[in-house]
Amino acid sequence: MNQTLLSSFGTPFERVENALAALREGRGVMVLDDEDRENEGDMIFPAETMTVEQMALTIRHGSGIVCLCITDDRRKQLDLPMMVENNTSAYGTGFTVTIEAAEGVTTGVSAADRITTVRAAIADGAKPSDLNRPGHVFPLRAQAGGVLTRGGHTEATIDLMTLAGFKPAGVLCELTNDDGTMARAPECIEFANKHNMALVTIEDLVAYRQAHERKAS
């Protein structure tokens, strides 16, 4: 990632700390991966605190595929099978079957309905019957070990939520341009500045976690 582009957001460690602070303040974070990987920016929000307005922003400016990142333990708690047995996608993205809240929604498509679905899925006592299948929210199962195991947006989301003190669950959606093309780093930076979002790269988060784990050992 071109560090010059990111310099206004601080050093790599500062970017992670700023992202954690933003999440605790109820703001979103733009997460960039490597230019040699997906080369995308994902808007992420804590599943616990994401507002209807933030969901609407995500739907309006994103790909439309609103994903709920969860751990494998949560996936098992909700009895959500993986979308396919043999995952042949380029990066092995861990989609489960899609979901909808069993109660409190209409068509499930609106920002408010998707928030209701997210909250139902992450509730402390959530059970499989709390969700209908299929639906309009796409759960993603994160790999154990986070970004140190897999350098994906899914794992970055779970790591950031955990480090910020939230439940290990977050909402993500890829940022797109007005013409429907994928937003790259310059557009992601412009969007983050416009919408008061912190910005961090997966590379930043890997370095941050490695440094903290070295200290802990």
Curated annotation (Swiss-Prot):
Q: Does the keyword Disulfide bond apply?
A: no
Residues reported in the UniProt entry to bind Mg(2+) 2:
E38, H153
Reactions this protein catalyses: D-ribulose 5-phosphate = (2S)-2-hydroxy-3-oxobutyl phosphate + formate + H(+)
User: What UniProt keywords are attached to this protein's entry?
Assistant: Lyase, Magnesium, Manganese, Metal-binding, Riboflavin biosynthesis
Q: What does this protein do?
A: Catalyzes the conversion of D-ribulose 5-phosphate to formate and 3,4-dihydroxy-2-butanone 4-phosphate.
- Spell out the residues of the site Essential for catalytic activity: H136, E174
| Cofactor binding note of this UniProt entry | Binds 2 divalent metal cations per subunit. Magnesium or manganese.
Q: GO CC: one term?
A: cytosol
Quaternary context: Homodimer.
Organism encoding this protein: Escherichia coli O1:K1 / APEC
Alphabetical list of Pfam families matching this protein: DHBP_synthase
Named cofactor requirement(s): Mg(2+); Mn(2+)
Q: Which GO terms describe its molecular function?
A: 3,4-dihydroxy-2-butanone-4-phosphate synthase activity; magnesium ion binding; manganese ion binding
Under which EC number(s) is this enzyme classified?
A: 4.1.99.12
Q: Which SUPFAM superfamilies match?
A: YrdC/RibB
* Cross-referenced HAMAP family: RibB
Chain sites annotated for binding Mg(2+) 1: E38
Pathway info: Cofactor biosynthesis; riboflavin biosynthesis; 2-hydroxy-3-oxobutyl phosphate from D-ribulose 5-phosphate: step 1/1
Record family assignment: Belongs to the DHBP synthase family.
InterPro entries named among the record's database cross-references: DHBP_synth_RibB-like_a/b_dom, DHBP_synthase_RibB
Q: What is this protein called?
A: 3,4-dihydroxy-2-butanone 4-phosphate synthase
Binding site residues for D-ribulose 5-phosphate: R37, E38, D42, R150, G151, G152, H153, T154, E174
The superkingdom listed in its UniProt entry is Bacteria
Q: Which GO terms describe its biological process?
A: riboflavin biosynthetic process
